[in-house]
């Protein structure tokens, strides 16, 4: 692999080079890390996280956002994080199929990443891929997560603006309240608002937000409505996204967002390294199950530590 040639094509705006670079990073090749080192921090895009329960219409909303942003002259990239099979590691890469109508538009790039067991709903390579997309020069990057739940708050650590998408479906809003994901959202969108119960969900959200503690950044989250297949509510959503971006700039919060993203990326690398070492240590785990090793001894061998040097284990 000629890293110099790939970097040159990348900087020339060749999307095939971008795709190759992301593949190298996602697969863990050293060439991918070398490219990241050379390209990180070149440009900064507006990063929007889209999260919500399965069936909330995230992909349809993403598709319509691409259309609306392109009409404004913005270039757009989408990272759609798909669920992985717990057995094969394969992903159901359906999001990209829904948005294939934008294929051929040089101002649009869509990529699906498999979550591969990432607890926060984000693939381990998501932030690294995000850095490559920024270096490529996209104006706006949409990151669509697997779903929503107690562990899926990682999106708020990656995105500048986090959009929580709900529907009038019974229990959808209540589940969001219980799961604690209310705190991660900068904007709320009740999609499929034309279905029965839409107004009820909007009122529930507004009431809950009025009682909630003030947002740390001083931002007051908005509750919006949309019917994504018809394009309804898209203009209001774009205005709200612009308003939040302006708020971050005025308060000087973009730098802290980037710092939090870097912290998340380092933590993700450490977690992925740990998962990889665990897979490599299946033999040791088998020996623990057979009573031949203690868990501490197995962990010491996995980490390459001398006996008795595993910190954090009680005496």
Label the model's feature ranges.
Residues 4-9, 15, 50, 54, ...:
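Expand to "…catalyze enediolate/carbanion chemistry for C-C bond making/breaking, isomerization
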Residues 92, 129, 154, 158, ...:
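Alpha-helical scaffold elements adjacent to nucleotide-binding pockets in ATP/GTP-utilizing enzyme cores
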Residues 140, 161, 186-187, 222:
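Well-ordered beta-strand positions
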Residues 187, 193-247:
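Canonical P-loop GTPase G-domain recognition
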Residues 225, 236-310:
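Long, well-ordered amphipathic alpha-helical subdomains in the mid-to-C-terminal portions
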